[in-house]
């Protein structure tokens, strides 16, 4: 009896403790709550006083481990190429030059990403890649040992152009194109054509270019750079700036169409410039090359739609490899047989038609092509920077080039503002769109050197004009890429309205 009574009393004590403890925690007026509150506040006050110990782990981990690993991988790759190819991998060889330019461009891009200026958005990495190649070319000791033959650089730049065209073709959404309002079409077509025409007129009278070369330069400058516009618009879109008016979506959708138009015009002018016949014969040859590229692109585009079939393993990888090899072969092959510009239009048509049937698998193929672009991007901008030599530039020539470029940009900005006047945007929004439609980078980095390489192979007597086109393209990237990124990052939050409620976001591309 005594034991049972003690057990009952013990159980009652436990029940009493468990019943009172939650009540004291729930009741904010209870003394227990105040005690626990003071204990928590004391611990919170003590926490900042604790010092974290910094130490280096053994073996190394993190960023330092990754840097050492990548360095060893690059060294092993160089050792392998040297053991197979010998002098090509030594200083002065092509592979050695490509490896130095590739690594320097990556380092230049990373350094530019690390530079942070208060209240200023980060600069695009491609600018660091461009400056890295420019530094390699213009430092005497380095330039003696880093050399890439023109044939090698031409093939790499043409391959980079192919990757850009594939991305542009796959990026064209047929549903969006079908339902696009007039404002998007105006933004994609109007500024590009007007800037190309303005640059042609200014270069003809200021730079003394023939008219065919003037329009060739105009279409080189007429393209906007999605590599600058799209990341900046995505940042603004994530923060809610201009989303209800559809400004980020408008600029991202129109950028691909703008590039397609500029590249098509460039290919047509390139065929005319480097053909040996008269004006009528050149026009007929251009129509033939366009017809051939369209027909071949449509036929092979439908082929790639269904081959490989959807039941194949690694479907996205096979599709990406097939479309990449087809398009690279077309671009390089058309240059080999003298049909300049045919491969570019073929690539656009093939990738667009093939992508319309791939539905969900299209995103996977785009990811594969993006990974390929990540490899060719530092090579492209590094090689473009390495083509520009300060010793060959004259101060008055640079002034003429900058004047031509600046006047063409002013025309583009003015035309963009005028075309947006009847689209339902406010004054500040029209100013932002006009300034955001200015940056140039990827297309100019490909088309400028392509003119130079074509002249070296087909018409050496036209090389002075091609060097001028190359220099203007370099200056266009150097001036507009960082300034455009900075203007979008700084003026976006100031000129665009911010919307916090995602349910109220509507895409309004009014006519």
Swiss-Prot record:
GO terms for cellular component: plasma membrane; sperm principal piece. Residues 1-10 have a biased composition (Basic and acidic residues). It is found in: Cell projection, Cilium, Flagellum membrane. Pfam families: Na_H_Exchanger. Residues 16-31 have a biased composition (Polar residues). Residues 1-41 are annotated as: Disordered. InterPro entries: Cation/H_exchanger_TM, CPA1_transporter, Na+/solute_symporter_sf. Keywords: Antiport, Cell membrane, Cell projection, Cilium, Fertilization, Flagellum, Ion transport, Membrane, Sodium, Sodium transport, Transmembrane, Transmembrane helix, Transport. GO terms for molecular function: antiporter activity. It comes from the Eukaryota. The chain crosses the membrane at residues 67-87, 95-115, 116-136, 152-172, 187-207, 215-235, 260-280, 284-304, 337-357, 368-388, 398-418, 431-451, 472-492. Sperm-specific Na(+)/H(+) exchanger involved in intracellular pH regulation of spermatozoa. Involved in sperm motility and fertility. Belongs to the monovalent cation:proton antiporter 1 (CPA1) transporter (TC 2.A.36) family. This is Sodium/hydrogen exchanger 9B1. The gene is SLC9B1.
């Amino acid at each position: 009896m005594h034991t049972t009574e003690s057990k009952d009393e013990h159980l009652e004590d436990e029940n009493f403790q468990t019943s009172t403890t939650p009540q004291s925690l729930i009741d904010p007026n209870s003394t227990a709550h105040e005690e626990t509150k003071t204990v928590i506040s004391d611990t919170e006050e003590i926490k900042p006083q604790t010092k974290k110990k910094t130490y280096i782990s053994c073996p190394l981990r993190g960023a330092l481990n990754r840097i050492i690993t990548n360095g060893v991988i690059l060294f092993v790759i160089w050792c392998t190429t040297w053991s197979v190819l010998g002098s090509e991998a030594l200083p002065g060889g092509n592979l050695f030059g490509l490896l130095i330019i590739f690594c320097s461009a990556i380092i230049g891009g990373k350094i530019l990403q690390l530079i942070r200026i208060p209240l200023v958005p980060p600069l695009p990495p491609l600018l660091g890649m461009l400056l890295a190649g420019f530094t390699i070319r213009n430092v005497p000791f380095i330039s003696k040992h880093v050399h890439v033959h023109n044939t090698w650089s031409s093939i790499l730049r043409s391959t980079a152009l192919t990757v850009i065209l594939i991305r542009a073709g796959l990026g064209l959404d047929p549903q969006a194109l079908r339902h696009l309002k007039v404002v998007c079409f105006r933004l994609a077509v109007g500024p590009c054509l007007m800037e190309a025409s303005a640059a042609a007129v200014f270069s003809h009278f200021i730079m003394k270019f023939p008219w065919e070369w003037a329009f060739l330069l105009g279409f080189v400058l007429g393209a906007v750079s999605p590599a600058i516009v799209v990341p900046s618009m995505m940042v603004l879109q994530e923060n809610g700036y201009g989303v209800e008016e559809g400004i980020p979506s408008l600029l991202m959708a129109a950028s691909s169409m703008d590039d397609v138009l500029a590249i098509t015009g460039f290919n047509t002018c390139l065929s005319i410039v480097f053909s040996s016949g008269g004006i009528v014969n050149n026009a007929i040859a251009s129509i033939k090359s366009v017809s051939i590229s369209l027909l071949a692109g449509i036929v092979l585009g439908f082929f790639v739609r269904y081959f490989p079939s959807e039941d194949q393993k690694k479907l996205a990888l096979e599709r990406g490899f097939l479309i990449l090899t087809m398009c690279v072969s077309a671009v390089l092959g058309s240059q080999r047989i003298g049909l300049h510009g045919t491969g570019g239009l073929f690539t656009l048509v093939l990738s667009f038609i093939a992508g319309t049937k791939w539905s969900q698998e299209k995103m996977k193929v785009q990811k594969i092509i993006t990974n390929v672009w990540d490899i060719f991007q530092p090579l492209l901008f590094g090689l473009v920077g390495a083509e520009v030599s300060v010793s060959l530039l004259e101060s008055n020539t640079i002034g003429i080039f900058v004047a031509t470029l600046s006047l063409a940009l002013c025309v583009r900005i003015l035309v963009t503002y005028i075309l947006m006047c009847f689209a339902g945007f406010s004054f500040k929004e029209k100013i932002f769109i006009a300034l955001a439609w200015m940056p140039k980078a990827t297309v100019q980095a490909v088309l400028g050197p392509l003119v130079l390489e074509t002249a070296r192979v087909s018409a050496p007597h036209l090389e002075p004009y091609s060097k001028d086109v190359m220099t203007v393209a370099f200056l266009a990237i150097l001036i507009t890429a960082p300034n455009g990124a900075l203007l979008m990052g700084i003026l976006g939050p100031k000129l665009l309205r911010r919307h916090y409620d995602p349910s109220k976001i509507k895409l309004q591309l009014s006519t």
